[in-house]
């Protein structure tokens, strides 16, 4: 049986299909990755014991290592949901996106990226991004076209849009962290807890240190009176909840149940 004889560092059809589908999606949440893994076993090796996800991905990564590619795990900056993306370790710049976008579209992304990294909030307004359209390299782009390109970035999970403002998707942070650190050394912000790149989060009003929202949630989880971990001054911000996959799953089941109930009622 294929599942019982495979060795570490060897890819089976299960691994290959998983990798191919992950490449198609670009980035997936952890629950989607687990579902994808199970699907691949069902298609290619249904009698095998499903590997632990961490072992399964480590096995693929050991093969991809020589190609400077890696399946990397991260979390969303707003609520700490685990995500996985296929990251090109050799090409960390915006040029990684070149196969999907034209030169002027990539330049628009660079402009948006710079505004986002430079901002205090980690967001750039669509107005500010569109005002830079005249400075783009390559073919001229109208503002209407630029709006459509920004939506392409959202659909491709490079950007997130919230109420007319844009920030980086977790995919962009996973793939471009090193590039961003090197390209914007004077603007880049780091989390005081995990020491990772920080685009959006909370900051201490006294000493200025910053923390990701999920890091804030975990750090202050059992502390009734939150104080800055650096200067010990009072932390004035609302403390978000720690991400709970079980709670989200229950909410999703409840939501789908209500939806099916409404369907039956009509």
From Swiss-Prot:
- The UniProt entry's coiled-coil ranges are none
Superkingdom of the source?
A: Eukaryota
Share the record's PTM remark: Ubiquitinated.
Looking up Gene3D superfamilies in the UniProt record yields: 3.90.1150.220, Winged helix-like DNA-binding domain superfamily/Winged helix DNA-binding domain, Zinc/RING finger domain, C3HC4 (zinc finger)
Q: Where is this region: Interaction with NSMCE3?
A: 1-102
Q: Any idea where this protein resides? A: Nucleus; Chromosome, Telomere
Please indicate if the UniProt record lists Nucleus as a keyword.
Answer: yes
Q: Which GO terms describe its molecular function?
A: protein dimerization activity; ubiquitin protein ligase activity; zinc ion binding
Q: Which residues cross the membrane?
A: none
Q: Where is the composition biased (Basic residues)?
A: 256-266
According to UniProt, the reaction catalysed is: S-ubiquitinyl-[E2 ubiquitin-conjugating enzyme]-L-cysteine + [acceptor protein]-L-lysine = [E2 ubiquitin-conjugating enzyme]-L-cysteine + N(6)-ubiquitinyl-[acceptor protein]-L-lysine
Task: List its EC numbers.
Answer: 2.3.2.27
Renumbered to this chain, region (Disordered) spans 246-266
Q: What CDD domains does UniProt report for this protein, alphabetically?
A: RING-CH-C4HC3_NSE1
- Write down the SUPFAM superfamilies for this protein, in alphabetical order: Cysteine-rich domain
Keywords per UniProt: Chromosome, DNA damage, DNA recombination, DNA repair, Metal-binding, Nucleus, Telomere, Transferase, Ubl conjugation, Ubl conjugation pathway, Zinc, Zinc-finger
> Where does the protein principally reside?
nucleus
Q: GO cellular component annotations, sorted alphabetically?
A: chromosome, centromeric region; chromosome, telomeric region; mitotic spindle pole; nucleoplasm; nucleus; Smc5-Smc6 complex
Provide a GO biological process annotation: DNA damage response
Family the UniProt entry places it in? Belongs to the NSE1 family.
Q: What does this protein do?
A: RING-type zinc finger-containing E3 ubiquitin ligase that assembles with melanoma antigen protein (MAGE) to catalyze the direct transfer of ubiquitin from E2 ubiquitin-conjugating enzyme to a specific substrate. Within MAGE-RING ubiquitin ligase complex, MAGE stimulates and specifies ubiquitin ligase activity likely through recruitment and/or stabilization of the E2 ubiquitin-conjugating enzyme at the E3:substrate complex. Involved in maintenance of genome integrity, DNA damage response and DNA repair.
Subunit structure and binding partners: Component of the SMC5-SMC6 complex which consists at least of SMC5, SMC6, NSMCE2, NSMCE1, NSMCE4A or EID3 and NSMCE3. NSMCE1, NSMCE4A or EID3 and NSMCE3 probably form a subcomplex that bridges the head domains of the SMC5-SMC6 heterodimer. Interacts with NSMCE3.
Protein name, entry field: Non-structural maintenance of chromosomes element 1 homolog
Annotated gene: Nsmce1
